[in-house]
């Protein structure tokens, strides 16, 4: 079954803001790979990000945070960026803020 990919406007902005084209292209390829069996890729997240998954891209530093909607056969990409543990700019902290501020709602 092929899933449709929906990239949230904020995630698209994060992706377009990457200055290294090679890294951006690698991330786009990983996003494209999510059309097939997205629930078998990445790892499930916990706590505030429960229900979302994280996939490594472009080496070990970058992450794609997404949610799989099996009923709609869609994958929602909510954030793309660098894992900076302990930083307010860490991709997981940014994803939590997006969800808390309701800047991304996969049910829309």
Labelled PLM ranges:
Residues 1-29, 104-108:
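Arg/Lys-rich, positively charged N-terminal/basic patches that mediate binding to nucleic acids
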Residues 4, 13, 59, 67-108:
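Enriched for short, Lys/Arg-rich terminal
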Residues 17, 34, 67:
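Conserved catalytic core of Hanks-type protein kinase domains
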Residues 18-24, 47-49, 57-62, 81-86:
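Short, charged helix-to-loop "capping" segments that act as catalytic/coupling loops
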Residues 23, 27-30, 41, 87-95:
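Amphipathic alpha-helical interface surfaces
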Residues 32-57:
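A short, surface-exposed loop/turn module that caps and links secondary-structure elements
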Residues 54, 63-67:
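Short, surface-exposed charged micro-motifs
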């Amino acid at each position: 079954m092929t899933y449709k990919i929906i990239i949230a406007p904020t995630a698209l902005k994060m992706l377009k803001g990457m200055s290294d084209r090679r890294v951006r292209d690698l991330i786009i390829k990983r996003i494209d790979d999510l059309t097939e069996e997205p629930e078998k890729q990445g790892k499930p997240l916990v706590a505030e990000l429960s229900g979302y998954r994280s996939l490594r891209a472009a080496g070990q530093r970058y992450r794609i945070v997404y949610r799989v909607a099996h009923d709609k056969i869609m994958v929602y990409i909510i954030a793309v960026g660098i894992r900076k543990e302990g930083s307010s700019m860490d991709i997981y902290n940014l994803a939590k803020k997006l969800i808390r501020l309701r800047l991304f709602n996969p049910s829309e």
